[in-house]
């Protein structure tokens, strides 16, 4: 039986595990740490939200799976928010989908769109799932520098021109 997992072997170390270990070591040394690594809540959920969740959980029509794209009214509300915020028109039936979260959404997008041999342009630095999602999908990564003193658009153009075959996807944050 083959117990090798080549996609997992291609994954780089997870930056939040590394920073987590560094934080724990610093705390064990007695250092005061302010954690900016992830947006984890540091307070209780507001009571009105808890009450609404309890109310919804008691409704019999909420005891099942949602439609695969997500509830239409929620998709419509998302599109309305993009219109207000960015003046962008989106079609809730064709251009909006509800996911469990951003990590799962990006990973599933790359699984759906990318294959072995495809290349994904990823800004560097970037959020870890931008790299992990492409690797899990079997794609190759082309890093595009986003650092002070480097013209991102020139780097992006160079990456597009020099990548063969042409990139399949570009991640924007």
Which residues are covered by each model-predicted region?
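Nucleotide-sugar donor-binding loop of glycosyltransferases
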Residues: 124-126, 145, 173
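Active-site phosphate-binding strand-loop segment of PLP-dependent enzymes
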Residues: 147-173
